């Protein structure tokens, strides 16, 4: 494949790259000579052999400016070709560019085009790969021209003949062979590459395309149409590769451009016969080097061996042809040549790959050099090694400013050496470069002074691998230090995810002025305080700093100086320095500004000052008038560093408060002030952490005395569960789940009590509690293990299916302070090892997810300001989500542009105008305005920009709180924002020691807040039963599915919280009841779905037979028989149907209700038993995912969603709104019908035994699942459309990150990725466009194809029109109108036309891997996966890569089209002249118009 013309590829400026199949002429045009010998170098002289694979005559000299024989040496002979050895005198670097060629004795088929799936050659010739293989490898003859003998024998073109058949025809029609080869009467049949070459040459692409399109239109056979379509795709690819090229020729004797005569357009493109090679290109020798080792041996590239095989076999074949060897020997040699060339191009695809002699590994062919992680694309083009860089271990630099890093002198002098040398020579300290180097080597003191001046104002870039997001590389101002380790500021550790246990970092020096400027303005660490993924601060104090600030701002009663009154903060500091007042003393300070406090000072006043005191009344009035402040000395010290505009922070500063404060500072006072504040609180934090002398001792871990009581109670409860199981009222699964629940609850109670115990210890100054409460280190989970009980341990299993046995049901009762027994220690090792193994295994999964995300979104760049769309995304206030800790309404709209006015429905006021950016203040206002239930916001999901996206649809750049700028690479930011937490969280697993978390299946649901109850669709029955103590137990049981309870504000009527009540729940309240917070509303059985009787009557079993549809399991411990429905489908005889169901029959024998019983159900009634409403008939066990707590469980789920995979057992979803009814039953499936009021009916077939959620007569909406199982995203797209599936994917992925990991990712990042998944449409009917049915194309390309034919019409009868007009032709309407006017004038027959048919399509949801491979850019797709396939398809179609994305520009070595690399910035010129400025402005504005429509 030739990428560009000219002797040196890819030099100079180019804007796009075309891929095509190299013709023999283009290979020869690039070649500098033919390689005739297989030798590489002479083993005696070590010089390249003439005409060999390393020949200097062909590829250029091995030494700069010196020919092979040594006649010409030195640069003055540049360009001369030596008359003795024929070598051109030039630089040795040409050996990286100059190519050679091998002329083959016979044509050879290129393996890529023959072995690719589907085979390109096979599609053109309509031959299967197997048949092609037999022809290519000289096993059978193929008929090229049947001629007269063929007609007589009934042989057609492309028929395969054996050797006997071929010779029989040749001998029978001997005279026929004397005819000329061009004579159509001559019988021609050949084998091998030559035959394929002749066949491909004879193909008429236009005629083939017409024939195939006819088959597509007219054939009724599906198979024929599918085959025709497959072939047509390849034919159309070849036809598309033809592009008109303007050619000119010179006048005879003309020399100048004006003497050129334009010729008619010449069509140049891929010809099918180019897939068969007559000439093989030989790549430059420096790209397949031969390196001498010690001991006279050589290391060589595998390609040299592969080329040698080709040359040896080719030369042998030429000799055999010359001596007219027998056909059998020739044929064998030709086959071997074909195999040698196959191995050269793609050795890995063959079963019998060519292997090396010593290590017996397959040789790396040209294809292997391109693909995979070690291939050319990923190893050398996307990831290069960088000069002016170094790496070293990092240590903390607590005295550094936020924008500084400590750079070891020895490292700095190496990195900045050229600059130091220049400065030394300029200042006359050294006479020459050589003497300057000597000064540096001697480490002369003056060198350090010069180095200081050189690095002043020159930032360096620090990078820590793995670079998971853009904050993994930041710029710092270097400070020279002694030692060998790099020092970094403690606050940037979070961004780099660095710690000081031996981590290393790399330093890079930006060289050019522009690079230094960008590093200082964009990448300086003090400008990167906000995380792009969520808009939250990243430079948040941690560990010692937090502990110091927490200790400083905490109050303690009884401290010296408590209750004193101070005039201002200066007085407080003087008193503290004089030791008249304690650090934690509660004091009063006169203050009149803004105060941020969360407590009521009037309540606290009584604890500080005695009510009877004379000061009490005055202080109270001062506090009420807000002229006085009740605070602590420590808080006064802390507030010395807080900017005045923020006010006085009168709170205990823990990590959360610090994070909020830094976020506020960043948006209100800017980065400069925030950076100062951060440096100050770093000093304060470290200082007071040291002053407090906070460390943990064994006595600080306090075990609560109540622990023993709780454990005894839990043991009693679990014994009770076992008794119930023994009585047979519980299944083994339920017993397991309930025991796990008992211990989970107990563990949590003990944890809470031990936490409270720590809190009360030493007035809250217990060091362990302080570390925990401040957020400095540790979690409640770890305190539970230290002072409570270790609790339940997860059994390490890769599957997260929730099968019983995921959690070991015997808990570890001891805690780490008391110490574990041997058995407990042994059980613990499970979890600890799981953590360690997960870390290594799952990191790779997360890294691969990041790579796929990156590849799919890398070309999403903000290209225009506003796409002008009128569509937006509807965001609703969801009460259920907001109270369960999911993303709030304000977070969803923050930083977006309103698509329409947002109204307060209670008073009809406009809260936010359309087109306005929803700032933090506006988002808070919307959240707090009760009347705003929904908002329509601009979103990238609805952006209509043709290339990239527009800044209005994206909204604000989260890291700078401003509308995103044109040129921002938002796709890459999105991929990093999603990938980084995935990787981080897998690494965090092992800190928990593998204890089971989450998992409590809450059986009681309590009211979240006060209010009045309102019921929606709640249908209940009253049920009475006798409990264990013989007392009647009356219960209200819910029998309706998806009923809801709302808690309503009695004054405004606004719904405060909504609960969905599970089927079978016990209600503890009534509609209209007033409820208090934490009052129990209902309780439910979490471990199973219950089938409940809704009417009284007798039970009758249908199709429930022992040993056929259910099995009886007698529990060995209890002797109780449990009846479980089994998978009975395999036991059915032919045409036999069964469906286990339980019917309820009234006294008259009429069936009142039928309940289908799914597989795995446990039966709770006997045949003929009497039941009452509310009785449990059967239970279907539910799988609970109990091992939560880290994203490891969630990562496969995220991958499944991003890959848009269909779940293994998907739910059947209704396609229309309507009512459910059940139809007839076949052998193993039954019908579910949904019929609407308009008579439309849809029928679904459900496997018998699958749990059906809908009942007879239930109303369902389009998109509602009717059976259990996960809903397939493909179904949502098909039924509810693209908007619904986009929302579904974004919400589901957010759930995994939010619930499993508590990670905040802004919706807009997920939207960018989901947008890329829905970019393509599949053509259904091509109409009159040039598209093909089944084509997968960009939505914008589809719209364009339809627009192109919108103004055209189809000619149905050409009438008396000229010959250029044909029936069936598409012409412009105005041209036909003009022609008809002419025809009418001349009284001729008019042209009859009809309107063109538009193409139709449907949207397609692609997984991120498929979407990345379907990208418009060939280079980007090839560097991602399936390199050879992508390049083969691109070459056949003559695809053009317009270099619009980032990846393809990095690969070809150009500036990326993002940020300052945008086209519009490349034309900027700097000038001081105002007239020139106006001219420049005009020139720059002109190309901008073009940019408007096309993005970049």
Curated annotation (Swiss-Prot):
GO terms for biological process: DNA-templated transcription. One of its GO terms (molecular function) is DNA binding. Keywords: DNA-directed RNA polymerase, Magnesium, Metal-binding, Nucleotidyltransferase, Transcription, Transferase, Zinc. Binds 1 Mg(2+) ion per subunit. Binds 2 Zn(2+) ions per subunit. Pfam families: RNA_pol_Rpb1_1, RNA_pol_Rpb1_2, RNA_pol_Rpb1_3, RNA_pol_Rpb1_4, RNA_pol_Rpb1_5. SMART domains: RPOLA_N. The RNAP catalytic core consists of 2 alpha, 1 beta, 1 beta' and 1 omega subunit. When a sigma factor is associated with the core the holoenzyme is formed, which can initiate transcription. Its EC number is 2.7.7.6. InterPro entries: DNA-dir_RpoC_beta_prime, DNA-dir_RpoC_beta_prime_bact, RNA_pol_asu, RNA_pol_N, RNA_pol_Rpb1_1, RNA_pol_Rpb1_3, RNA_pol_Rpb1_3_sf, RNA_pol_Rpb1_4. It comes from the Bacteria. Its cofactor is Mg(2+); Zn(2+). This is DNA-directed RNA polymerase subunit beta'. DNA-dependent RNA polymerase catalyzes the transcription of DNA into RNA using the four ribonucleoside triphosphates as substrates. Mg(2+) binds at residues 499, 501, 503. It catalyses: RNA(n) + a ribonucleoside 5'-triphosphate = RNA(n+1) + diphosphate. Zn(2+) 1 binds at residues 67, 69, 82, 85. It is an enzyme of class 2 (transferase). Belongs to the RNA polymerase beta' chain family. Zn(2+) 2 binds at residues 867, 943, 950, 953. GO terms for cellular component: DNA-directed RNA polymerase complex.
């Amino acid at each position: 494949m030739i990428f560009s013309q000219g002797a040196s590829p890819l030099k100079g400026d180019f804007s796009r790259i075309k891929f095509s199949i190299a013709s023999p002429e283009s290979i020869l045009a690039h070649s500098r000579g033919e390689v005739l010998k297989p030798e590489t170098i002479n083993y005696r002289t070590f010089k390249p052999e003439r005409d060999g694979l390393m020949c200097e005559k062909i590829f250029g000299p091995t030494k700069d400016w010196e020919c092979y024989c040594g006649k010409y040496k030195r640069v003055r002979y540049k360009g001369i070709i030596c008359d003795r050895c024929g070598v051109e005198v030039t630089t040795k670097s040409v050996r990286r560019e100059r190519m050679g060629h091998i002329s083959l004795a016979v044509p050879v088929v290129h393996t890529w085009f023959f072995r690719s799936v589907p085979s390109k050659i096979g599609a053109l010739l309509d031959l299967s790969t197997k048949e092609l293989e037999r022809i290519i490898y000289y096993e059978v003859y193929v008929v090229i021209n049947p001629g007269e003998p063929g007609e007589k024998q009934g042989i057609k073109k492309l028929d395969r003949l054996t050797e006997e058949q071929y010779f029989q025809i040749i001998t029978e029609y001997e005279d026929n062979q004397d005819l000329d080869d061009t004579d159509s009467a001559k019988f021609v049949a050949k084998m091998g590459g030559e035959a394929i070459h002749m066949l491909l040459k004879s193909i008429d692409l236009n005629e083939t395309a017409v024939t195939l399109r006819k088959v597509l239109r007219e054939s009724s056979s599906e198979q024929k149409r599918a085959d025709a379509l497959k072939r047509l795709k390849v034919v159309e690819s070849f036809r598309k590769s033809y592009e008109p090229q303007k050619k000119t020729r010179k006048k005879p004797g003309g020399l100048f451009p004006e003497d050129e005569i334009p010729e008619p357009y010449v069509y140049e493109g891929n010809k099918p016969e180019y897939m068969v090679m007559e000439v093989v290109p030989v790549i430059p020798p420096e790209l397949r080097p031969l390196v001498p080792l010690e001991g006279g041996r050589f290391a060589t590239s595998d390609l040299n061996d592969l080329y040698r095989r080709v040359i040896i076999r080719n030369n042998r074949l030429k000799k055999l042809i010359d001596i007219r060897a027998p056909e059998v020997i020739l044929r064998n040699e030709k086959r071997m040549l074909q195999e040698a060339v196959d191995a050269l191009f793609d050795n890995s695809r063959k079963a019998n790959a060519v292997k090396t002699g010593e290590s017996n590994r397959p040789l790396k062919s040209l294809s292997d050099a391109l693909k995979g992680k070690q291939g050319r694309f990923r190893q050398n083009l996307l990831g290069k090694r960088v000069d002016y860089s170094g790496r070293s271990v990092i240590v903390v630099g607590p005295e550094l400013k936020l924008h500084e890093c400590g750079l070891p002198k020895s490292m700095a002098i190496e990195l900045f050496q050229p600059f130091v040398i220049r400065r030394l020579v300029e200042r006359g300290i050294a006479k020459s470069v050589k003497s300057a180097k000597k000064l540096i080597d001697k480490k002369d003191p003056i060198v350090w002074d010069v180095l200081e001046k050189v690095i002043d104002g020159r930032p360096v870039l620090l990078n820590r691998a793995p670079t998971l997001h853009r904050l993994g590389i930041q710029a710092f101002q270097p400070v020279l230090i002694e030692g060998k380790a790099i020092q970094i500021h403690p606050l940037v550790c979070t961004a780099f995810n660095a710690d000081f246990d031996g981590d290393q970092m790399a330093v890079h020096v930006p060289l050019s002025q522009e690079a230094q400027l960008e590093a200082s303005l964009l990448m300086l660490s003090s400008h990167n305080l906000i995380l792009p993924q969520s808009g939250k601060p990243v430079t948040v104090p941690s560990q010692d700093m937090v502990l110091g600030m927490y200790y400083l701002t905490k109050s303690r009663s009884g401290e010296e100086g408590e209750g004193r009154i101070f005039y201002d903060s200066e007085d407080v500091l003087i008193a503290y320095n004089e030791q008249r007042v304690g650090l934690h003393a509660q004091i009063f300070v006169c203050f009149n500004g803004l105060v941020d406090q969360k407590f009521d000072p009037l309540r606290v006043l009584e604890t500080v000052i005695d009510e009877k005191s004379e000061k009490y009344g005055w202080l109270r009035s001062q506090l009420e008038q807000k002229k006085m402040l009740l605070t602590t000395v420590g808080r006064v010290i802390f507030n010395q560093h807080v900017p005045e505009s923020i006010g006085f922070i009168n709170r205990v500063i823990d990590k959360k408060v610090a994070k909020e404060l830094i976020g506020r500072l960043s948006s209100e006072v800017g980065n400069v002030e925030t950076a100062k504040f951060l440096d100050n609180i770093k000093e304060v934090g470290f200082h007071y952490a040291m002053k407090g002398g906070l460390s943990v001792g064994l006595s600080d871990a306090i075990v609560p005395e109540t622990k023993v009581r709780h454990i005894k109670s839990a043991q009693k409860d679990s014994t009770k569960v076992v008794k119930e199981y023994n009585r047979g009222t519980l299944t083994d699964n339920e017993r397991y789940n309930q025991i796990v629940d008992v211990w989970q609850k107990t563990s949590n109670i003990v944890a809470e009590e031990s936490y409270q115990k720590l809190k009360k210890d030493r007035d809250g100054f217990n060091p362990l509690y302080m570390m925990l409460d401040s957020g400095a280190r540790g979690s409640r989970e770890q305190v539970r293990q230290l002072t409570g009980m270790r609790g339940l341990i997860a059994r390490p299993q890769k599957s997260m299916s929730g099968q019983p046995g995921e959690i070991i049901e015997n808990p570890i009762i001891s805690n780490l302070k008391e110490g574990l027994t041997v058995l407990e220690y042994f059980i613990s090792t499970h979890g600890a090892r799981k953590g360690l193994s997960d870390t290594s295994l799952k990191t790779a999964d997360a890294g691969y997810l990041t790579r796929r995300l990156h590849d799919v979104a890398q070309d999403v760049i903000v290209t225009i300001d506003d796409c002008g769309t009128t569509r937006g995304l509807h965001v609703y206030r969801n009460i259920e989500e907001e109270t369960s800790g999911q993303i709030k309404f304000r977070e969803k709209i923050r930083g977006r542009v309103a698509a329409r006015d947002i109204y307060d429905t209670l008073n009809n006021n406009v809260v936010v105008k359309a087109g306005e950016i929803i700032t933090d203040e506006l988002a808070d206002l919307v959240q707090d305005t009760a009347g705003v239930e929904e908002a329509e916001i601009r979103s990238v999901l609805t952006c209509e920009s043709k290339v990239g996206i527009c800044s209005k649809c994206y909204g604000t750049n989260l890291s700078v709180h401003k509308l995103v700028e044109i040129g921002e690479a938002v796709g890459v930011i999105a991929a990093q924002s999603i990938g980084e937490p995935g990787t981080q969280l897998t690494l965090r697993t092992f800190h928990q020691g593998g204890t089971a978390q989450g998992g409590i299946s809450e059986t009681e649901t309590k009211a979240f807040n006060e209010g009045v109850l309102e019921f929606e669709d709640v249908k209940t029955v009253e049920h009475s039963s006798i409990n264990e103590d013989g007392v009647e137990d009356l219960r209200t049981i819910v029998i309706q599915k998806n009923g809801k309870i709302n808690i309503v504000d009695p004054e405004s009527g606004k719904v405060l919280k909504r609960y969905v009540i599970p089927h079978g729940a016990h209600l503890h309240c009534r509609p209209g009841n007033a409820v208090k917070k934490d009052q129990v509303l209902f309780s439910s059985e979490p471990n199973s779905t219950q089938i409940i009787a809704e009417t009284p009557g007798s039970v009758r079993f249908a199709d429930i037979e022992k040993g056929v549809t259910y099995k009886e399991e007698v529990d060995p411990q209890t002797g109780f028989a449990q009846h479980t429905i089994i998978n009975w489908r395999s036991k059915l005889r032919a045409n036999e149907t069964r469906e286990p169901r339980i019917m309820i029959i009234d006294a008259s024998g009429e069936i009142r209700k039928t309940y289908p019983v799914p597989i795995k159900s446990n039966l709770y009634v006997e045949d003929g038993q009497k039941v009452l409403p509310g009785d449990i008939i059967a239970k279907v066990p539910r799988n609970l995912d109990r091992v939560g707590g880290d994203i490891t469980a969630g990562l496969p789920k995220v991958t499944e969603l991003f890959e848009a995979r269909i779940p293994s057992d998907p739910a059947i979803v209704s396609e229309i709104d309507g009512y459910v009814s059940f139809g007839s039953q076949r052998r193993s499936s039954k019908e579910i019908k949904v019929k609407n009021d308009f008579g439309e009916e849809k029928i679904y077939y459900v496997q018998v035994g699958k749990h059906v959620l809908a009942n007879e007569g239930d109303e369902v909406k389009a998109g509602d699942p009717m059976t259990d199982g996960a809903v397939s995203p493909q179904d949502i797209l098909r039924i509810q459309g693209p908007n619904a599936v986009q929302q579904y994917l974004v919400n589901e992925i957010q759930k995994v990150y939010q619930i499993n990991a508590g990670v905040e990712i802004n919706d807009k990042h997920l939207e960018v990725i989901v947008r890329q998944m829905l970019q393509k449409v599949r053509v259904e009917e091509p109409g009159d466009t040039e598209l093909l049915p089944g084509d997968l194309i960009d939505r914008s390309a589809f719209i364009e194809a339809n627009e192109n034919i919108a103004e055209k019409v189809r000619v149905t009868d050409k009438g008396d029109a000229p010959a250029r007009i044909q029936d069936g032709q598409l012409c412009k309407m105005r041209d036909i109108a003009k022609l008809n006017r002419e025809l009418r004038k001349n009284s001729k027959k008019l042209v009859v036309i009809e309107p063109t048919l538009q193409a139709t399509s449907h949207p397609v949801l692609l997984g991120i891997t498929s979407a990345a491979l379907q990208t418009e850019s060939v280079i980007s797709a090839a560097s991602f996966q399936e390199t050879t396939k992508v390049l083969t398809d691109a070459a056949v179609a003559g695809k053009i890569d317009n270099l619009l994305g980032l990846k393809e520009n990095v690969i070809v070595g150009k500036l990326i089209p993002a940020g300052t690399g945008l086209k519009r910035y490349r034309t900027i010129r700097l000038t001081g002249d105002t007239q020139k400025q106006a001219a420049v402005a005009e020139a720059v504005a002109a190309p901008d118009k073009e940019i408007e429509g096309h993005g970049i």
